[in-house]
Amino acid sequence: MLDLTKFTTEQRNQKSMDLDTMTSLQIVTTMNDEDLRAVQSVTKVLPQVATAIDWAAEALERGGRVFYMGAGTSGRLGVLDASECPPTFGVSPDLVVGLIAGGETAFIKAVEGAEDSEELGASDLRERGLSDKDLVVGLAASGRTPYVVGGLAYAKATGCKTIAIACNQGSKIGESADLAIEPVPGPEVLTGSTRLKAGTVQKLILNMISTGAMVKIGKVYQNLMVDVQQTNEKLVVRGQNIVMEVTGCTRERAVQALADAGGHVKTAIVSVLLDCDAAQAAVALERAHGHVRTAVSGHEKSNADVQ
């Protein structure tokens, strides 16, 4: 029988032993204190997270994909982070992919037995044509989920680089992956409920990996989302504001530049800063491999120049 008590994520938290007698304020104070400890645990693994960013960027730049895979909360967090990449960074939904044991149904309803199948983890990657250009990131709070173990084993056999994110040190998935990221947020306020601190920690790390990788491949200029997709009124205005913020131009000029660029924010920025048409701006961006800073290097205008 599996001994869960050896996992810190399954142990009892001594600070919440009387959780059922606490007032509401005591409950939230205890949870907040424990959340702070969880956040602090990420500090110890920042060098590994930085390596993960570099590996993800390298995979994307060579035409590969990044796969997140997990079960339950871990799987849902991977799907959540992956699904935010297209609207935020203007990338294809096939570029960063979240896989959850049991498929889409498992996102809202538990699928019995799905996480216990190593073969399911392998087959989910096989069905998506995994290649050695790709990167696979396995997520499991316990660090032992069979679905993730099987996926990582298949990925390694395919020649992929692999990363494991677990909330226990010396985890099974960590030992099998090329890179182990193992923060230790400690026992949960509600014993074994890894949707809490363990989930928070995993989400923080995924935020860093996806954001950092997108910065590295040119999806960000300064600290602005210059590849944001303008899919609603708010994002249309945001696109205009970004062009205005970067170039110092008027809204009227930003609107026109975006129209000429087919709504592509980066092209609009470069066209204003280089005082060229959208086609020329697109060429400059292509030569710079999509990096705005490189495309406009030495050509930045003062606000007065671009009104």
Each model region followed by its residue ranges:
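Aromatic/hydrophobic pocket-lining residues that form π-stacking "cages" and hydrophobic walls in ligand
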Residues: W55, G151, I209
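Short, amphipathic alpha-helical interaction segments embedded in low-complexity terminal/linker regions
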Residues: M208, A213-Q307
